[in-house]
Amino acid sequence: MSSGWAVFSYAVAALAAIAIVVFIVRRRRRQAVTEPSSEVSYLRGLDFLIYDQRDKAIKELADATARNTDDVAAYISLGNLHREQGNIDRSIRIHESVSIRPNLPLQSRVRALYSLGLDYVRGGLLERAEAAFKKAIKEDPNHIQSYESLERVHEEMRDWKAAYECQLELDKRTKKKSSRLLAYLLTEVALEEAMRNKRPKEAISLLHKAKQTDPTCVSVPMYLGDVYLAQGDFKKAEHV
């Protein structure tokens, strides 16, 4: 699970970088001649990012933030680069300082909180990551990336019920139905009910719900059989 999360985090960072870089560079390059030197450094940093020259990009973005402390986009990009380089403490400090700035535009605050959440995930601080993603969602209830990351954090924390509820909300926002994932999460909730909470009836009900959600879920009959066996109901266990 951890390796899968790492791959996901790298993929998110890479796609996000490509998406913003191409757009921003094209839009702002024409203004670079007349803008302050911080703007020039910012654009150079994005250029280096395009060509995967991370160390040079960090230097230029650091110069941009030093010359203009109000350049929020440069700060967030700089923090993301530090995270990719493994400088987690530094990326956390940068994104945290941006996220608490007063009078910050909504999307900038959301982006800073989301980036902060990814920092915490990379550092293994899952409870803090959970809090950061929830704050991002509170600021922007339609921020899909935060829902996706929050669901994965809940899975990492083995909080299956929270993961299920988060995925339901995500499907509602995206107008999709992730039947296979929802069924899987329901089976994990059911297993927790049966094993930890000693509530087999609730577990059986949840497993039937998982079966309705995804009739192809192979875990359902296996778990149902286990629950029936634990109850001593060998007949039902045999005919699951």
Predicted regions and their residues:
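Alpha-helical segment of the N-proximal tetratricopeptide repeat
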Residues: 36-70, 84-87, 93, 118, ...
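TPR-repeat structural position
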Residues: 54-55, 88, 126, 160, ...
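Long, contiguous interaction/recruitment modules in multidomain scaffold/adaptor proteins
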Residues: 1-36, 135-152, 156-179
